[in-house]
Amino acid sequence: MNDSDEFFEVLAYVRASRHRSNIIKFLAHGLKTPKEIGVELDIRTNHVSNLLADLKKKDLVFCLTPNVHKGRLYKLTDVGCKISEYLGDV
């Protein structure tokens, strides 16, 4: 499997979930906390945290403040930014 195959598998993974897609699109606008994401997208904060953990495992998001208990800041990785560009075209 080459890099483009892996990229499109990750893109399909994100598109398979409305919440994952919306989080990626929302993070394309800058740094956000799980609470900000939850309020904006109408998703419970604990569910947002689980989704962010999944997206982090796929190397789509990065936590800038991992040692902070509340108010962690998340941003998209380079791959996450590419995914958001594809989602913007959908």
List each language-model region with its residue ranges.
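Conserved segment of winged-helix/HTH DNA-binding domains
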Residues: 73-90
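Short capping segments at the starts of secondary-structure elements
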Residues: 18, 29-33
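Short amphipathic alpha-helical interaction segments
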Residues: 43-57
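Beta-hairpin "wing" of winged helix-turn-helix
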Residues: 58-69
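A short acidic, leucine-rich amphipathic alpha-helix
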Residues: 36-40
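Pre-recognition alpha-helix immediately N-terminal to the DNA-recognition helix
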Residues: 21-25, 82
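Short alpha-helical segments that sit at the start of domains
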Residues: 1-21
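Residues within the helices of the helix-turn-helix
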Residues: 34-35, 53
